[in-house]
Amino acid sequence: MVESITDHSISEFPQTQSLRRGIRTFKPRRSRITKSQQHAVDNPQALLIDFQYEFLNWPHPPTPLYLDIGFGNGASTLALARQEPDSAFLAVDVHTPGVGDLLSELHEQEITNVRVMETDAIAVLENMIRPGSLAGIYTLFPDPWQKARHHKRRIVQQGILDLMHSRLTSGGFWHIATDWPHYAESISELFARPSNTKKWSSGKQARPERAVTRYEERAIFEGRAVTDFHFLAG
């Protein structure tokens, strides 16, 4: 039987504080998984990591570790891994088809500096990432949660901002991209708070050299401008 992502209940994901409150930053999608995607998930060849309530023992220092949150079909993750073969990338997403796509491409291209997790990234940050251990975090095109009553679900908010800062090395970065102007405005306002300007520097920047994701292609086709942010942890 072909499984859809909606067959997963919220109880299958780690119960972080935010989830116990019934608030999550991701949205289950009604999407089908192909046979090739399912095969990649079922045969991960040690590239797929299970969630655990202990710190991740990968990679071995001094290899820099980067976290890619919500990688979609994995195009950006693959490009980063190819560009920086001496770095390590932990890619986290909750959607099985995308996980299958990324695992399949990693196997086909024989890329070994990426590990993949199908779970809630906030739970991973809270429980598996050592404080001060990340060289950078990528969050490209997170769900904008456009309705005002859903803004509390956005991944770029104060509580999560503090969590991200605690896991980054001094000088580590958080790269965020969005195609929704109201979300971009709220990100600018959040990082401009006095308490945050003491901890973070930089902000909006010209689009860096990075892979164009499938979602970004659609946004551009529909006429939405993309805003990139690059914040450095002090």
Protein language model regions, located:
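Conserved SAM/SAH-binding beta-strand->alpha-helix loop
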Residues: 95
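A short glycine-rich, Lys/Arg-flanked "PGG" loop and its adjoining helix->strand segment in the class I
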Residues: 156-170
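S-adenosyl-L-methionine
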Residues: 2-65, 75-82, 103-131
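Conserved beta-strand/loop positions that form the S-adenosyl-L-methionine
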Residues: 69, 92
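Class I SAM-dependent methyltransferase "Motif I" SAM/SAH-binding loop
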Residues: 70-74
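Conserved beta-strand signature within the Rossmann-like core of class I S-adenosyl-L-methionine
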Residues: 170-178
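Class I S-adenosyl-L-methionine
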Residues: 186-189, 193-234
